[in-house]
A protein has these predicted regions:
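Active-site metal-binding motif and surrounding structural segment of the metallo-beta-lactamase
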Residues: 44, 55-102
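FMN-binding flavodoxin-like domain, especially the glycine-rich phosphate-binding loop
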Residues: 173, 183-224, 229-231, 273-287, ...
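Active-site neighborhood of phospho(di)ester-bond hydrolases with catalytic His/Asp-centered motifs
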Residues: 49-51, 73-81, 101-105, 161-164, ...
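Conserved beta-strand hairpin/beta-sheet module of binuclear metal-dependent hydrolase folds
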Residues: 5-64, 152-155, 159-163, 267
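Short acidic active-site motifs
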Residues: 88, 294-299
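Active-site-proximal loop/helix segment associated with metal-binding centers of metalloenzymes
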Residues: 146-150, 158, 166-201, 247-251
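Terminal amphipathic helices with adjacent charged low-complexity linkers/tails
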Residues: 226-253
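Metallo-beta-lactamase
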Residues: 5-9, 102-150, 206-209
Length: 400
């Protein structure tokens, strides 16, 4: 007989896997899919925390039917209104017209806009409580992690924190729902960084504030139940919490990301010389990304991870190579902080790339290393020394 996964005797995992979609938010590649997590608590009153993408509502409702056996859903707590979590709300209300919807003021503004629902609402603020029998929920507002209406929900008897998108990750779940069953833990944490960089990274100060509020409440947490990815158990959650503490505080590892575009291989040769110079100077973590081939989400993951960033571009139509410009914009809008930066370029007849790359450090309020250099055509011997020296300068600054 099919068994719906359980976190405790009365708390069920009713999320679904999406292995069909190629890009999360129609932007970020998800080769291993993604999970849309929702949770059902059964007590004197039944309470659902979030829903799933409407494309998977049939699977979601089937799970609810198996558990409820004809009982209604009494409450829906909305931690996050984004359609991958709130997409089935309208259908859910049609099924359970007497269901009370729990959220904050901003939740209800969005609920009206996305679903036209304006009745049967139960508004909560930080510190408010809702009892459904032996279970009691309290609420903690977490605005801009990563939408303005986001809130966390804490269930006291089982010590569960339902954390919306915080502590989530890309990747569908393969049978097990708990982090204790992860067979490739570091790979999963790498995916968490990629998810954070792409989806939440712009809002680091708000993440940091939400983490501080969790600590201020003194919550005793046994399980953390995010909207994507595994459910964290107490011991394993230290990994996820530590990762979020570091990322939201702009803490980085000693290492360098080299981003380059190259039409005919000349700029790529310069990137390789820089990497070799860094290695010779003792830098252990060096990542080179050809921006026309590397996945942008993987590039962002590495930019969030390492302190050093070197960008190289050929001149193209008197401007930057457009894939480089696109990546710079992704970095710009995430307001990545506290990096050590260097630049280099190439051209055939009219130099332009380097003078457009140099101001990026000042714009982002980063520390710039060196003046950079620029290769004309394929005259590699004329700049090989400058490339090597720039790598050495970057290494020295990282180790200072």
């Amino acid at each position: 007989m099919y068994q719906v996964p359980q976190i405790t005797d009365s708390v069920y995992y009713v999320g679904v896997n999406d292995r069909m979609k190629e890009r999360f938010e129609n932007v970020w590649s998800i080769p291993s899919g993604v999970a849309y997590n929702a949770y059902l608590i059964v007590d004197e009153k039944t309470t659902l925390i979030d829903t799933v993408d409407v494309c998977y509502s049939d699977i979601f409702f089937h799970k609810l039917d198996l558990i409820l056996q004809g009982r209604p859903v009494d409450y829906l707590i909305i931690n996050h209104m984004e359609p991958d979590h709130g997409g089935s709300i309208g259908l859910l209300r049609q099924r359970y017209p007497d269901m009370q919807i729990v959220g904050n003021k901003k939740t209800f503004d969005m609920l009206s806009g996305f679903h036209g629902i304006t009745t049967g609402l139960h508004e909560v603020k930080s510190g408010d409580a809702l009892r459904i029998g032996s279970h009691e929920f309290s609420f903690l507002m977490a605005p801009m992690v990563h939408w303005p209406e986001v809130m966390f929900t804490y269930e006291q008897s089982n010590r569960l924190l339902f954390s919306a998108d915080a502590f989530g990750s890309f990747g569908a779940l393969s049978g097990h729902i708990f982090d204790s069953h992860l067979t490739e833990r570091q790979s999963y944490l790498d995916e968490m960084v990629r998810y954070y960089a792409c989806v939440i990274g712009k809002y680091g100060p708000f993440v940091k504030k939400a983490l501080a509020n969790i600590d201020k409440q003194g919550l005793d947490i046994e399980y953390v139940c995010p909207s994507h990815g595994v459910v964290w158990m107490r011991e394993g959650f230290a990994d996820a919490r530590g990762l979020y503490d570091r990322l939201s505080s702009n803490e980085t590892e000693e290492g360098v990301v080299i981003l380059y575009g190259s039409m005919y291989g000349n700029t790529e040769q310069l990137a390789d010389i820089l990497a070799q110079s860094l290695a010779a100077s003792g830098v252990k973590s060096i990542v080179c990304h050809n921006v026309t081939k590397s996945d942008p989400s993987v590039i962002l993951r590495d930019v969030f991870r390492y302190r050093g960033l070197i960008i190289g571009s050929p001149t193209y139509c008197g401007e930057l190579f457009s894939p480089i410009e696109n990546l710079m914009n992704l970095i710009r809008i995430r307001d990545v902080k506290d990096r050590i930066y260097a630049a280099f370029g190439s051209y055939a007849w009219a130099p332009a790339a380097l003078k457009r790359l140099r101001p990026f450090a000042e714009e982002m309020k980063w520390e710039a290393v060196g003046e950079g250099f620029e290769l004309k055509m394929a005259d590699l011997p004329s700049v090989i020394g400058a490339a090597w020296d720039l790598g050495t300068q970057m290494a020295e600054r990282l180790k200072a």
